[in-house]
């Protein structure tokens, strides 16, 4: 009989059944007990025309409070940045948009070169010796860094600063659980890693110390001090970083980082309700053969022409699974391309200007909140974000803000017991003086 959900004719079905030697479709399911088989039809709406379906989906999408129709001050790892128009044009080209793993370099030079350029730009921004072709996102990149450190040092403890993104820390803990690796949190003091606590916690079983730069609260930490303490204990120093900030801050590679990871979402990748994004992973040369994921290398073919190939693949799952340094055997090539196009379009000066604007506008917001009577929790150098104390539940304040067309900040109380009624406000280069003033005024009214 003709199947309700399969677009094949009865003749198609008959031919297929004949080939496999059964007389009916029902015969294929004889091993499934009759009493557990679904009877009847699913309650699915009748089919619609394409125009009617588009109208319905558009109406559903219109219920979303997006950053096109609203002013966003929400960050916490995913930011509303400027995306050069050329980004979507380039990544929508069919040779990139539909490309798969470039196992055949002779027909994949375009994709391989694009990945190579991404690796080069990330290595330059982070000040590291080399970078891989990308990771799934910043969280998985950080977790892979922790596992690399544990494998390299053959130690079973990782110290993670409390100022690292809470969700990133959760991903690290999930990876560590399966490897029987102990995760110890270094408390924060005044919004930065507590150095005294770090010195007490670190020992000769510590594989790595993980810090964030700038950290989750927007504070620019003195990561060189943290790195020195890690290296004194012969531990690796892992830095999770915002690559946009590295357009103006000293890169982690020059401050002692052994591994630098992060998320390239800030360059040409939409918020997209949290993903997909593009993690990056950069290391010093001594760790080159233990980097997870793919590496693209530049070489010369038999005729002396420059070419690009996947290289050092013995690190990957191409070898025996238990011998691989990581079971991540893919990458976010399309999103890495988006980040590469954005970085290229902006150029060094553009990235520096973009970073400078983020600092300046964050400082303006801090001053505006303090002038309005709010307390900004942590002082010191900020990038992108500040922590503001309120008198009321942050979620209730955010409900009031969205009615005014403003997407409020991240409620820190859900991750930090000591920061109940504190909100993480993100200010990017897209925000104007008028928008910042409106946020402060509306929060002031709701805060009273």
Swiss-Prot record:
Q: Which CDD domains match?
A: GDC-P
Q: Name one Pfam family in it.
A: GDC-P
Entry-linked Gene3D superfamilies: Aspartate Aminotransferase, domain 1 (3.90.1150.10), Type I PLP-dependent aspartate aminotransferase-like (Major domain) (3.40.640.10)
**What reaction(s) does this enzyme catalyze?**
N(6)-[(R)-lipoyl]-L-lysyl-[glycine-cleavage complex H protein] + glycine + H(+) = N(6)-[(R)-S(8)-aminomethyldihydrolipoyl]-L-lysyl-[glycine-cleavage complex H protein] + CO2
> Does the keyword field hold Oxidoreductase?
yes
GO annotation, biological process:
glycine decarboxylation via glycine cleavage system; nucleoside metabolic process
Query: What are the recorded GO MF terms, alphabetically?
Result: glycine dehydrogenase (decarboxylating) activity
E.C. numbers: 1.4.4.2
Q: Domain of life here?
A: Bacteria
Q: Which UniProt keywords apply?
A: Oxidoreductase
Give the enzyme class. Answer: oxidoreductase
Protein purpose: The glycine cleavage system catalyzes the degradation of glycine. The P protein binds the alpha-amino group of glycine through its pyridoxal phosphate cofactor; CO(2) is released and the remaining methylamine moiety is then transferred to the lipoamide cofactor of the H protein.
Subunit-level organization:
The glycine cleavage system is composed of four proteins: P, T, L and H. In this organism, the P 'protein' is a heterodimer of two subunits.
Q: Which family does it belong to?
A: Belongs to the GcvP family. N-terminal subunit subfamily.
Q: What is this protein called?
A: Probable glycine dehydrogenase (decarboxylating) subunit 1
* Species for this entry: Lysinibacillus sphaericus (strain C3-41)
- Encoding gene (name): gcvPA
């Amino acid at each position: 009989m003709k199947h309700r959900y399969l677009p094949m004719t009865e003749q198609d079905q008959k031919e297929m059944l004949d080939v496999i030697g059964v007389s009916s479709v029902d015969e294929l399911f004889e091993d499934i007990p009759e009493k557990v088989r679904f009877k009847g039809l699913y309650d699915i709406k009748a089919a619609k025309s394409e125009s009617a379906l588009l109208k319905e989906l558009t109406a559903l999408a219109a219920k979303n409070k997006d950053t096109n129709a609203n002013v966003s001050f929400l960050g916490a790892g995913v930011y509303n940045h400027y995306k050069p128009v050329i980004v979507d044009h380039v990544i929508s080209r069919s040779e990139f948009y539909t490309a798969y793993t470039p196992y055949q370099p002779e027909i994949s030079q375009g994709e391989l070169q694009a990945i190579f350029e991404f690796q080069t730009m990330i290595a330059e921004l982070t000040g590291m010796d080399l970078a891989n072709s990308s990771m799934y996102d910043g969280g998985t990149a950080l977790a892979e860094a922790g596992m690399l450190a544990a494998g390299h040092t053959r130690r079973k403890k990782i110290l993670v600063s409390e100022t690292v993104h809470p969700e990133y820390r959760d991903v690290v803990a999930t990876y560590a659980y399966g490897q029987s690796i102990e995760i110890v949190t270094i408390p924060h003091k005044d919004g930065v890693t507590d150095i005294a606590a770090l010195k007490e916690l670190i020992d000769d079983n510590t594989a790595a110390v993980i810090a964030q730069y700038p950290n989750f609260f927007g504070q620019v930490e003195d990561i060189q001090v943290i790195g020195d303490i890690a290296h004194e204990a012969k531990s690796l120093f892992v830095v999770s970083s915002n690559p946009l900030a590295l357009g103006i801050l000293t890169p982690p590679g020059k401050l002692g980082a052994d591994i630098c990871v992060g998320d390239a979402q800030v360059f040409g990748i939409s918020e997209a309700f949290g993903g997909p994004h593009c993690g990056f992973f950069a290391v010093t040369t001594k760790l080159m053969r233990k980097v997870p994921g793919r590496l693209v290398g530049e070489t010369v073919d038999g005729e002396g022409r420059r070419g690009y190939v996947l290289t050092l693949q013995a690190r990957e799952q191409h070898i025996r699974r238990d011998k691989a340094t990581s079971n991540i055997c893919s990458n976010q090539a399309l999103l890495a391309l988006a980040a590469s196009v954005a970085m290229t379009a902006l150029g060094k000066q553009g990235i520096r200007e973009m970073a400078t604007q983020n600092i300046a506008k964050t400082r303006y917001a801090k001053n505006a909140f303090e002038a309005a009577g709010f307390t900004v929790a942590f002082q010191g150098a900020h990038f992108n974000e500040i922590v503001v104390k309120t008198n009321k539940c942050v979620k209730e304040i955010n409900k009031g803000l969205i009615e005014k067309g403003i997407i409020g900040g991240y409620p820190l109380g859900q991750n930090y017991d000591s920061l109940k009624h504190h909100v993480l406000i993100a200010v990017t280069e897209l925000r104007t003086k008028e928008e910042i003033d409106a946020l402060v005024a509306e929060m002031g009214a709701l805060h009273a």
